[in-house]
Regions:
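Transmembrane alpha-helices
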Residues: 22, 107-110, 114, 118, ...
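Hydrophobic positions within alpha-helical transmembrane segments of bacterial inner-membrane proteins
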Residues: 17, 21-29, 33, 59, ...
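Periplasmic/extracellular loop-to-transmembrane helix junction in inner-membrane transport proteins
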Residues: 1-22, 34-43, 80-84, 186-195
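Non-cytoplasmic
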Residues: 70-71, 148-186
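Interhelical loop and adjacent transmembrane-helix boundary motif
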Residues: 1-5, 169-209
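Membrane-interfacial helix termini and adjacent extracytoplasmic/periplasmic loops
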Residues: 1-4, 62-99, 169-173
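C-terminal transmembrane helix and the adjacent membrane-cytosol boundary/short C-terminal tail
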Residues: 42, 108-122, 126-130, 194-229
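Transmembrane-helix boundary motif in ABC transporter permease subunits
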Residues: 19-50, 63-65, 113-115, 120-121, ...
């Protein structure tokens, strides 16, 4: 059984992952739709930039976030001057780091789902008088929803497992930024904390497994729905 402190770590991880997913979802969908449906110069470069967090060391991503959101960074300075807000050493900063790391996976899953929608259906709707927004809301979005949700769940799984960018950007503050991966890392540094490592690791694996199964089921549902059409 987990004690109160350990349950707090789990709750913080779920909060960080949930906020990261919710904030990143509309951004990821917009980027996925842009890459799937719009032709523009430099599309390959934009696609590569979106997927950079997948290949760049997470520490580098965390450092770049620190430069951007730090007290002397352009975004951090703006947040402090206008809203009196700082994300350094805060759980909100951990959510930002998790969202950035999850973004490429979400965009990729959503883009595949949008591209799977037959353009002939969209063209047929337009010939019947439907405008671009109506085609999007009544056809493209409903058909791609299962894939979009699958990408969101996959992003959530990635968010709750984020370590490198988080510890670099917002450090490892118990009760504030110490999510499950960071708590496991801290426990590994403590002699005789093997039981704690096991408990937290089992919770982490369990949450990730549930999220991955949900993502797979949604992906299959999306495939069946499009196959029927």
């Amino acid at each position: 059984m987990l004690d109160a402190t350990e349950w707090g770590i789990v709750a913080l991880s779920l909060k960080v992952g949930g906020v990261a997913m919710a904030v990143t979802l509309p951004i990821a969908f917009a980027l996925a739709w842009l890459l799937a449906r719009v032709r523009f110069p430099g599309k390959v470069v934009v696609d590569a930039a979106i997927h950079l967090p997948l290949v760049v060391p997470p520490v580098v991503t965390g450092w770049l976030l620190l430069l951007a959101f730090g007290p002397n960074g352009p975004i951090g300075d703006w947040l402090q001057d206008w809203f009196g807000v700082t994300v350094l050493f805060r759980w909100t900063g951990a959510a930002i780091a998790a969202g950035v790391m999850a973004l490429p996976l979400m965009v990729r899953a959503m883009r595949i789902s949008i591209e799977a929608v037959d353009r002939r259906l969209e063209n047929a709707a337009r010939t019947l008088g439907a405008g671009p927004w109506r085609v999007f809301w009544t056809l493209t979005l409903p058909l791609s929803i299962p894939g979009v949700l699958a990408g969101a769940v996959l992003g959530f799984a990635r968010s709750i497992g984020e370590f490198g960018a988080t510890i670099t950007f917002v450090s490892n503050v118990p009760g504030e930024t110490q999510t499950l991966p960071l708590a496991i890392y801290s426990a590994l540094q403590q002699p005789g904390a093997d039981a704690l490592v096991w408990r937290l690791s089992c919770v982490s694996v369990g949450l990730s497994l549930i999220a991955l199964i949900a993502s797979e089921l949604l992906t299959r549902r999306a495939g069946r729905g499009l196959h029927v059409l």
